[in-house]
Curated annotation (Swiss-Prot):
Modified positions (Phosphothreonine) in chain numbering: T492
Taxonomic lineage from the root: Eukaryota, Metazoa, Chordata, Craniata, Vertebrata
Chain residue ranges for the region called ID2: 306-367
Subunit structure: Forms a large corepressor complex that contains SIN3A/B and histone deacetylases HDAC1 and HDAC2. This complex associates with the thyroid receptor (TR) and the retinoid acid receptor (RAR) in the absence of ligand. Interacts directly with RARA; the interaction is facilitated with RARA trimethylation. Component of the N-Cor repressor complex, at least composed of CBFA2T3, HEXIM1, NCOR1, NCOR2, HDAC3, TBL1X, TBL1XR1, CORO2A and GPS2. Interacts with ZBTB33; the interaction serves to recruit the N-CoR complex to promoter regions containing methylated CpG dinucleotides.
Name of the gene encoding the protein in the UniProt record: Ncor1
Compositional bias segments (type: Polar residues): 181-204
Taxonomic superkingdom: Eukaryota
Domain remark in the UniProt entry: The N-terminal region contains three independent domains that are capable of mediating transcriptional repression (RD1, RD2 and RD3).
Biological function: Mediates transcriptional repression by certain nuclear receptors. Part of a complex which promotes histone deacetylation and the formation of repressive chromatin structures which may impede the access of basal transcription factors. Participates in the transcriptional repressor activity produced by BCL6. Recruited by ZBTB7A to the androgen response elements/ARE on target genes, negatively regulates androgen receptor signaling and androgen-induced cell proliferation. Mediates the NR1D1-dependent repression and circadian regulation of TSHB expression.
Organism of this sequence: Rattus norvegicus (Rat)
Protein name per UniProt: Nuclear receptor corepressor 1
Mod. after translation: Ubiquitinated; mediated by SIAH2 and leading to its subsequent proteasomal degradation.
Length: 533
């Protein structure tokens, strides 16, 4: 409890005291994260213990009104939930005391909070004795699980952990318990039904992860402990958390947050999870992409191709895949994400077409970008104006070619601008993803969000060198060469290109930076998109 409450109670106290989720979202998130982390720690420490004890205890909690009560307050006061594993494990009594304390200490604020929540104030109001609270909880909190937004978010994160991490037995057992707890506390089940979408979904999600986990839950056990904690929270929350606060809103954001957290914090778990999931792609966030990978032969083949190339070319992929499982799609293929699916699907089937498309695209992207890069970096001496000129020249030629190509494959034409924007932004990004994020075009490729900084930083070298190789190593030299010739930049930079690109990356980056909004990029994109359209 000490662990959890201090940060939690700090914010959650505020929440409860204020009775409003006046706490800033940052604080919520902080609370959630802290709680999650603390719970993760606790869970890791207690892990199986807490999951086991929490499972049994959860039953106890639910069975014991006091416990249930604590559950109530914990619902609003995550501290007790964390505490529960601790407290319960150390002593149910302490937990009960804590329950009494927490319900009361939070009860006042909670009552405030609850009443604000508009929960049946009568039951809220009385800092009922734990049992009475349990009753009250059964009554009031059930309806609105006094779930603080933080708790709700935490629940969501927990949920996501459980779901994404495919948590661990804890979640499974927890949820088994939770069902039992639900059975033991059918009343809660009602609230669950009331909030059923979420609580049930949580329960369902967890059980679902549970089975999924089972093979891995041993592995996840520690990690799972995190979910274990989460599951405790989850089962507690799952029932207590009938988030009064609209689950969807926070849930979504939190899920995203939790996803991000997962992607960040879960990098390891993600990779670990990846064992349960498709290795490269943990669907932590881009489940869609994972799905896409599994479903889309193009993506699949591309990924394989990329993996092979990257593996052969060396660590780029390992970093990439390891770094962000779901993002290979973004980072690796120059263009797999946007309309590429349609246009490149045939491209995949048809290497020649692929060459054509990607050749053109690379001419445009690689060429113009390389011109940017190499003109910026290698040809830095050239006036900036020259760079735009040369880049635009290459762009024009490539865009014209693209138009020609576009005529053959309208998709490709249309998609290309996107792809180009994407790839360009991606590439320009890659050297300095951080800055590029600042870049206006950053948005153009959402992928950047997932495949962020590190990955890109790694990418630049192979992004240009190897990525072309995805369509054919020749293209890279070819494109830059031709484009460079087009842009009348000495072909020699080609040799320098990779190093120049990587080395120049910072410089070019800054330049590209300066230029990104500038006509060079914007104009090119405008032109390309317009001409293609």
């Amino acid at each position: 409890k000490d662990k959890g409450p201090p940060p939690k109670s700090r914010y959650e106290e505020e929440l409860r005291t204020r009775g409003k989720t006046t706490i800033t979202a940052a604080n919520f998130i902080d609370v959630i994260i802290t709680r999650q982390i603390a719970s993760d720690k606790d869970a890791r420490e207690r892990g199986s213990q807490s999951s086991d004890s929490s499972s049994s205890l959860s039953s106890h909690r639910y069975e014991a009104p006091s416990d249930a009560i604590e559950v109530i307050s914990p619902a609003s006061s995550p501290a007790p939930p964390q505490e529960k594993p601790q407290t319960y494990q150390p002593e149910m009594v302490k937990a009960n005391q804590a329950e009494n304390e927490s319900p009361q200490q939070y009860e006042g604020p909670l009552t405030h909070y609850r009443s604000q929540q508009g929960s049946p104030s009568p039951q809220q109001q009385p800092p009922l004795p734990p049992s009475s609270q349990a009753e009250g909880m059964g009554q009031v909190p059930r309806t609105h699980r006094l779930i603080t937004l933080a708790d709700h978010i935490c629940q969501i994160i927990t949920q996501d952990f459980a779901r994404n991490q495919v948590p661990s037995q804890p979640s499974t057992s927890t949820f088994q318990t939770s069902p039992s707890a639900l059975s033991s506390t059918p009343v809660r089940t009602k609230p669950s039904s009331r909030y059923s979408p979420e609580s049930q979904s949580q329960t369902v999600l967890h059980p679902r992860p549970g089975p999924r986990v089972s093979p891995e839950n041993l592995v996840d056990k520690s990690r799972g402990s995190r979910p274990g904690k989460s599951p405790e929270r989850s089962h507690i929350p799952s029932e207590p958390y009938e988030p009064i606060s609209p689950p969807q809103g926070p849930a979504v954001h939190e899920k995203q947050d939790s996803m991000l957290l997962l992607s960040q914090r879960g990098m390891d778990p993600a990779e670990q999870r990846s064992d349960s999931r498709s290795p490269g792609s943990i669907s932590y966030l881009p489940y869609f992409f994972t799905k896409l990978e599994s479903t889309s032969p193009m993506v699949k083949s591309k990924k394989q191709e990329i993996f092979r190339k990257l593996n052969s070319s060396g660590g780029g992929d390992s970093d990439m895949a390891a770094a962000q499982p779901g993002t290979e799609i973004f980072n690796l293929p120059a263009v797999t994400t946007s309309g590429a699916v349609s246009s490149r699907s045939h491209s995949f089937a048809d290497p020649a077409s692929n060459l054509g498309l990607e050749d053109i695209i690379r001419k445009a992207l690689m060429g113009s970008f390389d011109d940017k890069v190499e003109d910026h970096g290698v040809v830095m001496p050239h006036p900036v104006g020259v760079v735009p000129g040369s880049a635009s020249t290459s762009v024009v030629t490539s865009s014209e070619t693209r138009r020609d190509e576009g005529d053959p494959s309208p998709h490709s034409g249309v998609c290309k601008p996107k792809l180009i924007n994407k790839s360009n932004s991606r590439k320009s990004k890659s050297p300095i993803p951080g800055q590029n994020y600042l870049g206006t075009e950053r948005p153009s490729s959402v992928s950047s969000v997932h495949s962020e900084g590190d990955y890109h930083r790694q990418t630049p070298g192979w992004a240009w060198e190897d990525r072309p190789s995805s369509t054919g190593s020749t293209q890279f030299p070819y494109n830059p060469l031709t484009i460079r010739m087009l842009s009348s930049t000495p072909p020699t930079p080609i040799a320098c290109a990779p190093s120049a690109i990587t080395q120049a990356a910072p410089h070019q980056q800054s330049r590209i930076w300066e230029r990104e909004p500038a006509p060079l990029l914007s104009a090119q994109y405008e032109t390309l998109s317009d001409s293609d359209d």
